[in-house]
């Protein structure tokens, strides 16, 4: 009897760390802009990716697309590097603004040629989402309407290639264009949900003196991907209100969360690890939002 008791106790002790590890397995992507200093200072990409995977990040969002390549690598090479490190390719920030000539003429067909090439490269890299990282405040309502039409067309082409297109906000989108319409609201209301989603950067919404949850309720289902960001390390400032954000993720339509650490109070490696640990330990952050 005593032997059986000891065996059971030993089995329970073995299960404790496994259970703890299981609790900390969450689908959390990282925006590679967060580690730009490491990459720009010459640290090999495969080393950076491996370290991120070992920390517990499960996928990446690229931030360095240029002329058919990601961080100097072909789409296939980049995809292989990410997967070899033990992560998945999720999304990429990529943009081409309209020229003054295109705005004046109302014809953005030339830019769409660029997008066709970019979409092909992103598809080859295994991307699920392409996100425009932001545009400036349009000078006129006509220009803003044109950008919505432009984004709808890009989104349609992404959809035809098995991807989705989104727009990432900052705080300036709360400005009114020609004193008529709030830029962010107008863009959400004048883009087709079938073609365009919004990657809400929760930090910039708060910095713009608005509530992410209010926007979730105002435009339910439009925020497929969230950028989880803070002033520096995630969770440190106390200003963003992550608890309420995550508890209302369902109404927002969230499928993925992407950590972005733009500023640091410690070395980059420590900063991105500390930010991830906050999300892994937070009871209000689910293991996955895509299921």
PLM segments and residue spans:
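Acidic/histidine-rich catalytic cores of soluble enzymes
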Residues: 59-60, 159-246
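Acidic-and-aromatic substrate-binding clefts and catalytic sites of carbohydrate-active enzymes
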Residues: 36-42, 62-74, 96-112, 136-145, ...
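Bacterial N-terminal signal peptides
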Residues: 7-15
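Aromatic-rich peripheral "rim/lid" segments of glycoside hydrolase catalytic domains that contact
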Residues: 237, 248-249, 254, 262-291
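Positively charged n-region of N-terminal signal peptides that target proteins for export
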Residues: 1-5
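N-terminal pre-domain/capping segments
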Residues: 7, 20-128, 277, 281-291
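Active-site acidic/histidine proton-transfer and metal-coordination neighborhood
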Residues: 100-197, 269, 289
